[in-house]
Design a protein with these regions (language model features):
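Long helical/loop segments within the catalytic core of UDP-sugar-dependent glycosyltransferases
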Residues: 115-158, 162, 166, 180-231
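A conserved acidic beta->alpha catalytic loop
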Residues: 95-115, 149
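Short, well-formed alpha-helical segments that are part of the catalytic scaffolds
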Residues: 45-48, 70-83, 104, 155
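N-terminal membrane-anchoring/stem segments of glycan-assembly enzymes
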Residues: 1-55
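The conserved acidic donor/metal-binding loop of glycosyltransferases
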Residues: 173-177
Length: 231
């Protein structure tokens, strides 16, 4: 009868209404949790950066990047590394016997001059030719190592480690884009952990299709070509 139909319809209405309400509140709570976590991470990271920046005990970091025949992009890539945010770091570019104008371009752009240097070969590598630094104070963080080609990236990285003057180092590719605060994020678990931290690593992502300005990614976009898109 009509009364039973109305009663059944009302029960269905209450069921669907409360179900949708529950889904709404669960979704809202989940989104709120994510937002709070991001905000907490932001404030924790900001505080950590401030503490590291102002502390007189902040350890130095050497960013080591081998370069072989990188004449087309070497200046942009080195500028990207020099633009990193950290109170005490140096950029060690290892010219691994390039046969193009990689070294010449760096020499001209950064006003490099050969300087005397006590090279201690703690790790065996191919012969070390010379060490160059900029005569321009603007590029005082930059060190360029010129060596014979070692055939592997590891040989060039080891030469950079031999030259590095700071207790911590990061080995990367010269064409990799490091996030602006990457050094803060790498050193943070080392100085904040109660246990000894031997090494840390970052997340590697494809930059194909992204918009890069002044050595930093300002707009993340999906690659348009098939292979990078698949990667």
């Amino acid at each position: 009868n009509m009364r039973d139909i109305i009663f059944t319809f009302f029960n269905y209405f209450v069921f669907f209404y409360t179900s949708m309400l529950a889904i709404f509140f669960v979704t809202f709570a989940f989104l709120s949790f994510i937002s709070l976590k991001r905000r907490k991470d932001y404030y924790v990271e900001s505080y950590m950066r401030k503490t590291i920046k102002e502390s007189p005990y902040t350890p130095g970091i050497s960013v080591i990047a081998p370069a072989f025949n990188e004449e087309k992009t070497i200046i942009d890539n080195v500028n990207s590394m020099l633009a990193l945010e950290y109170p005490l770091f140096e950029v060690v570019i290892v010219n691994d016997g390039s046969t193009d104008s990689t070294l010449e371009k760096m020499t001209e752009y950064y006003e490099l001059v050969e300087v005397p240097y006590a090279y201690i070969e703690r790790i065996k590598t191919r012969p070390f030719r010379r060490l160059l630094k900029s005569s321009n104070p603007k590029y005082s963080r930059l060190i360029v190592v010129d060596k014979e080609n070692g055939g592997t990236k590891a040989d060039a990285s080891n030469a950079g480690i031999n030259v590095a003057s700071h207790p911590y180092f990061i080995c990367t590719d010269v064409d990799c884009i490091l996030e602006k605060y990457a050094l803060y994020r790498c050193i943070s678990p080392i100085i904040s952990s109660e246990k000894q931290v031997i090494a840390v690593s970052g997340t590697m992502l494809m930059a194909n299709g992204c918009v890069v300005k002044d050595g930093q990614i300002i707009d993340v976009r999906t690659p348009r070509t098939p292979i990078p898109l698949f990667q």
